[in-house]
Each structure stands twice: as structure tokens, then as C-alpha cells.
């Protein structure tokens, strides 16, 4: 199988359920930013211990972003891939991890370790994807809501990954 099709040589790309749009169109800009976010989450996952809870969570988040990108690359009448449950799971993970860390009282300087730094990079890329999605105003979709929760989760995961310095004595 060849990786290239030549179909995009004219500056267009195909949508999930048919149709073509310019590669500079809003949905493709959104998906480009989300693709970068997914790659950053993958980088963070590569720095985590294989099989650890954070590693498993990161791979699930990467898979959620596939679903989100399919949602964006679909005509409005076919948007139903991203489910409210995905945002609720993300929110429950924020709540769960928040119990294991002491929330910083000041601004956080990223870079305590490689994993937390990668998660902070992922967070900033996710926030850019969210800003791009807001500008596109995706009708009948949970894309912006999910990206908002995901950026909060990435921030929380980064604080958790910083280690015992941000965890209360009861969980050290």
C-alpha cells in the first residue's frame, strides 16, 4: 500500500463521509491543531512507564482525539461521533487526580521533569486547538467542550507527574 494518493496535490483533502475541502479550510486547520495535540500526548506517553495508569490514560486520550478529528472532518449532518461521556470521563479523571495533588497557589513554571514538561506542551497545543475550534464554530458538536476539558486534564496530569512535591503528605 502506498502512503500517497496524489488526490491532495490540488490543495484539497477528503472529508470523512465524502466531499473535498481546501487544505486551508477551517475544519482542516482545526484537525491540524488537534493532530499536533495528539502527537504531543503521544510524546508524553512515551515518557511514562508502559502499562502505568497515566500511560493507559494517555493512549485513551489519543484515541479520543481520533474520534474528535473524525467529527470535525464530517459534514454537519453526520456529526455524532464525539459523545458527552467522553467529556465526563475526562472531567472525572481531573477530579480523581486533583485528590492526589496539592493545587499550586502560584503560577507553575513548567519543566519539573520530562513527563510534566511534555504534558504542559500538550496542554498548550490543546488550548491552541480549542481556540481554532472556537473560531470554526462547529455546529452540533462537543469538540470545543471536550478540548476545554482535555486541556484542564493535561494541566492536572502535569502537576501530578511533577511527583511528591505537589502531593499532600497523605498520598506520598
What are these regions (language model features)?
Residues 1-172:
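Phosphate/pyrophosphate-binding loop motifs in nucleotide- or prenyl diphosphate-using proteins
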Amino acid at each position: 500500500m502506498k502512503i500517497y494518493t496524489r488526490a491532495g496535490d490540488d490543495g484539497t483533502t477528503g472529508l470523512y463521509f465524502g466531499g473535498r475541502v481546501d487544505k486551508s479550510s477551517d475544519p482542516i486547520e482545526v484537525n491540524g491543531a488537534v493532530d499536533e495535540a495528539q502527537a504531543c500526548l503521544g510524546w508524553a506517553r512515551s515518557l511514562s512507564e508502559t502499562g502505568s495508569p497515566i500511560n493507559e490514560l494517555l493512549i485513551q486520550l489519543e484515541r479520543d482525539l481520533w474520534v474528535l478529528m473524525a467529527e470535525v472532518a464530517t459534514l454537519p449532518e453526520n456529526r455524532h461521533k464525539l459523545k458527552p461521556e467522553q467529556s465526563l470521563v475526562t472531567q472525572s479523571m481531573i477530579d480523581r487526580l486533583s485528590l492526589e495533588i496539592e493545587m499550586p497557589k502560584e503560577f507553575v513554571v513548567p519543566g519539573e521533569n520530562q513527563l510534566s514538561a511534555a504534558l504542559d506542551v500538550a496542554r498548550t497545543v490543546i488550548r491552541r486547538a480549542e481556540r481554532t475550534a472556537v473560531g470554526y464554530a462547529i455546529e452540533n458538536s462537543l469538540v470545543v467542550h471536550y478540548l476545554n476539558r482535555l486541556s484542564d486534564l493535561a494541566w492536572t496530569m502535569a502537576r501530578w507527574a511533577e511527583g511528591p512535591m505537589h502531593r499532600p503528605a497523605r498520598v506520598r
